[in-house]
Structure formats: C-alpha cells, structure tokens
From Swiss-Prot:
One of its GO terms (biological process) is maturation of SSU-rRNA. Belongs to the RbfA family. Keywords: Cytoplasm, Ribosome biogenesis. SUPFAM superfamilies: Ribosome-binding factor A, RbfA (SSF89919). This is Ribosome-binding factor A. It is found in: Cytoplasm. NCBIfam families: rbfA. InterPro entries: KH_dom-like_a/b (IPR015946), RbfA (IPR000238), RbfA_dom_sf (IPR023799). It comes from the Bacteria. GO terms for cellular component: cytosol. It comes from Ralstonia nicotianae (strain ATCC BAA-1114 / GMI1000).
Length: 123
C-alpha cells in the first residue's frame, strides 16, 4: 500500500483555502462598518491542529490598524458563522493581521526606479 505523504498538509491547505473564501464572503455581507474600508483577504495560515488561523488582509480606504481592530473585534462572530458553514471537527480561532507586503513592494519598486534614474543621469 503506498504511503500518503503530505496528505495532512494538503488537507491543511484545502481547509485554509475554504476558510479564506468563506470569510471573504462573510466579511463583505455581514460586517457593515464604513471605518473598515474595502478588505481583501490575502492568505490564511492554519496551525497543524486547526486550533488557530492567521488571516492576512489588505485594506483600501481605511487605516490598517482600524480595520484590524474591527476584524479582531468581530472574530468571535465570524467564527460562529464559519462554524455553521464548515464541516470540520475544529473551527479555528481567528486572528486578523494586516499584510503590508503590497506597500513594501511598491516602495521597493519606487526605490529601484529612483536608483535607475539616478544611474542613467550619471552616465
């Protein structure tokens, strides 16, 4: 009988993906707070025992700290809604974290463009 290598990590990824899809829909439909802006979920990371989920998001039209505070305040409510949708033994505790990688990428691109322009001027 062949060994099932990596099946746990595959399941972990499938559940994380399902949580991301469901949460994106629930946040859009259930959280009506204009101070939160437009939230986009970037990724979900689950612990191996499915007890905790780190949800990384970006936000448009609001302060990231304010959006994170609102999402973490509503985490219990979102958890209860997820519980009704997911058919798994343990629905993880939700922890929302702002993903600043997009802004860092834009800043890095700007610095590279600036360095290239400076080098072209020197030549």
């Amino acid at each position: 009988m062949p060994k099932k290598s990596g099946s746990a990590s595959g399941r972990n990824l499938r559940i994380a993906d399902q949580i991301q899809r469901d949460l994106a829909e629930l946040i859009q439909r259930e959280i009506k707070n204009p101070a939160m802006g437009l939230v986009t979920l970037q990724s979900v990371s689950l612990t191996p025992d499915y007890a905790h989920a780190k949800i990384y998001f970006t936000v448009l039209g609001a302060e990231p700290d304010a959006a994170a505070a609102i999402l973490n305040e509503k985490a219990g409510y979102l958890h209860s809604l997820l519980f009704k949708r997911l058919h798994i033994h343990t629905v993880p505790t939700l922890h929302f974290h702002y993903d600043g990688s997009v802004e860092r990428g834009i800043e890095m691109s700007r610095l590279i463009d600036q360095a290239n322009a400076s080098r072209a001027k020197d030549d």
